């Protein structure tokens, strides 16, 4: 990835459909059609990455493995696969299907030894998902608490994790803006890169995130705002690729 802010349109799959949830609540879905059609639409509009999520696997209510694999195999761009990656078999299945990167969430909390081994072995092919509610991590599709985020982050730093996907659960799908304070806290405590997720509602949000590239924000996952038409993907990509304004200064670290 380059010095620009990398944009990852989200394609979340539940029950075989592309959906968007509010705050990760399974019953809050809005459907947007066939996942492959949606992913190919974003690819055709210029996306270089897709954030592809198996929500059923994340919630532990089945999986969409065949659909996920089909989408990965039929795209010509980078795909980050997330949802239900909790053991070696599911990790290798996603990578063998052609995923550029795999996002590990619950396993980072429930099986730290395996997670630390994976971080060391796979390097850039793995990101750790930090799904944050308050100062706690959320696990199992955001249905359980998983410990204090800064404690888990310290352990992952010791293991050499290179990238974190940081989601503010309260903002996700709500179009209320990213949690910039949370991003600042994480960036101040890691040598790795951070991909921001949750709450992006307008191009101005992307401009602000673009200004955080110098402190470690590498990318942004955008879902609902694209699906409901708050802005177009080409317009968003233009913002993410634009030079950082001269009067832009990174936020100070937050204790």
Swiss-Prot record:
Pathway: Amino-acid biosynthesis; L-histidine biosynthesis; L-histidine from 5-phospho-alpha-D-ribose 1-diphosphate: step 4/9. It is found in: Cytoplasm. It catalyses: 1-(5-phospho-beta-D-ribosyl)-5-[(5-phospho-beta-D-ribosylamino)methylideneamino]imidazole-4-carboxamide = 5-[(5-phospho-1-deoxy-D-ribulos-1-ylimino)methylamino]-1-(5-phospho-beta-D-ribosyl)imidazole-4-carboxamide. GO terms for molecular function: 1-(5-phosphoribosyl)-5-[(5-phosphoribosylamino)methylideneamino]imidazole-4-carboxamide isomerase activity; phosphoribosylanthranilate isomerase activity. Pfam families: His_biosynth. Its EC number is 5.3.1.16. Keywords: Amino-acid biosynthesis, Cytoplasm, Histidine biosynthesis, Isomerase. It is an enzyme of class 5 (isomerase). The keyword Cytoplasm applies. GO terms for cellular component: cytoplasm. The active site is at residues 12, 131. CDD domains: HisA. InterPro entries: Aldolase_TIM (IPR013785), His_biosynth (IPR006062), HisA/PriA_Actinobacteria (IPR010188), Isoase_HisA-like (IPR044524), Isoase_HisA-like_bact (IPR023016), RibuloseP-bd_barrel (IPR011060). GO terms for biological process: L-histidine biosynthetic process; L-tryptophan biosynthetic process. PANTHER family: 1-(5-PHOSPHORIBOSYL)-5-[(5-PHOSPHORIBOSYLAMINO)METHYLIDENEAMINO] IMIDAZOLE-4-CARBOXAMIDE ISOMERASE. NCBIfam families: hisA-trpF. Belongs to the HisA/HisF family. This is 1-(5-phosphoribosyl)-5-[(5-phosphoribosylamino)methylideneamino] imidazole-4-carboxamide isomerase. It comes from Cutibacterium acnes (strain DSM 16379 / KPA171202) (Propionibacterium acnes).
